[in-house]
Regions:
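Beta-strand/loop substructures that line and gate deep hydrophobic ligand-binding cavities in soluble
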Residues: 3, 25, 102-153
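Short, flexible helix/strand-to-coil boundary loops that buttress conserved ligand/catalytic motifs
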Residues: 43, 53, 79, 105-107, ...
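Short beta-edge strand/loop motif at the mouth of beta-sheet-based domains
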Residues: 27-28, 47-85, 169
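Short, conserved beta-turn/loop elements at beta-strand boundaries and strand-helix junctions
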Residues: 96-101
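Hydrophobic pocket/interface hotspot
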Residues: 39, 49, 75-77, 92, ...
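Hydrophobic/aromatic beta-strand elements that line small-molecule binding cavities or substrate pockets
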Residues: 30, 64-67, 88-94, 105, ...
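Short, highly charged C-terminal tails/helix-capping segments
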Residues: 162-169
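Hydrophobic ligand-binding cavity/cleft-lining segments
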Residues: 1-59
């Protein structure tokens, strides 16, 4: 079962592709017009992550972000939406600078996913592949298309941030 959606490109002309590769795995790919070092920093430096991680259209705000970005380190994000809060937390399983991040998503207990993000640079551009592996089909179904749509929006926001960062560096 491969389900694929390709969304409209942003001003940089890059598309985000969302694929459900199996009953348990969701894969999101996008090329960014920035070196892997810069894209990786946007994922691992809290002051940068805060600028793009929250989908603007969803009316959410990021109340707090704690991240010890190293193998074995922990993270915790607290969001506010419609007068309620949501927490996301887990552990960094692998951190390989400028090439790979792997973390657990523990807020759902045994139904948590494992996220792997790879950064592959070619000619100053970075192919980012994000794989979310869920423990079951039901867990992935429960995440629904909302999570995929949010990721598409946040990747567009990341694209905008990288353009700004590239102009500053």
């Amino acid at each position: 079962m491969v389900e694929q959606r390709e969304l409209e490109p942003t001003p940089t002309k890059n598309r985000t592709i969302v694929e459900r590769n199996s009953e348990r795995e969701l894969v999101v790919t996008r090329t960014f017009n920035a070196p892997a070092r810069l894209v990786f920093e946007a994922w691992t430096r809290p002051e940068l992550l805060k600028q793009w991680w929250v989908p603007k259209s969803m009316g959410m705000s990021l109340l707090s972000l704690d991240a010890d970005v190293r193998t074995g380190g922990r993270y915790r994000l607290v969001f506010s939406h419609d007068a309620s809060t949501m927490e996301f937390f887990g552990k960094y399983i692998e951190v390989t600078p400028h090439s790979r991040l792997v973390w657990s998503n523990e807020e759902s207990g045994d139904n948590g996913s494992v996220t792997t993000v790879t950064f592959e640079e070619t000619d100053g551009r970075t192919l980012l592949v994000m794989r979310e592996l869920y423990p079951s089909k039901e867990a992935l179904d429960a995440a629904g298309t909302g999570a995929a749509d949010a990721t598409v929006e946040t990747f567009a926001q990341l694209d905008e941030l990288l353009v700004t960062l590239g102009a500053r560096r």
